């Protein structure tokens, strides 16, 4: 649909970048936005950079002050738990 806007913030591997480039270049879709790519970091010669109907951003999904604080507090609690002989929360490979 030529008015469609495609957004990918999942994984770069779920999109065929060559097909997305063609769809954008030939106006099969109106616009796209992504923060993930087939190859990361994205090479400077990626043809998507030539297009003006795509917004590309670096993949920074959790880079907020709140996230940094939560990760720091969680990590500190895990260390405290282990030092006190307790199993850490969310231990996935026990």
Please name every model-derived segment.
Residues 3-94:
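Rossmann-like dinucleotide-binding domain for NAD(H)/NADP(H)
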């Amino acid at each position: 649909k030529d008015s469609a806007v495609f957004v990918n913030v999942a994984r770069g591997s779920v999109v065929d970048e060559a097909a997305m480039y063609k769809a954008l270049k030939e106006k099969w879709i109106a616009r796209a936005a992504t923060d993930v790519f087939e190859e990361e970091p994205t090479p400077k010669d990626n043809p998507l950079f030539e297009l003006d109907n795509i917004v590309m951003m670096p993949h920074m999904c959790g880079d907020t002050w709140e996230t940094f604080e939560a990760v720091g507090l969680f990590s500190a609690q895990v260390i405290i738990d282990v030092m006190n002989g307790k199993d850490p929360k969310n231990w996935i490979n026990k």
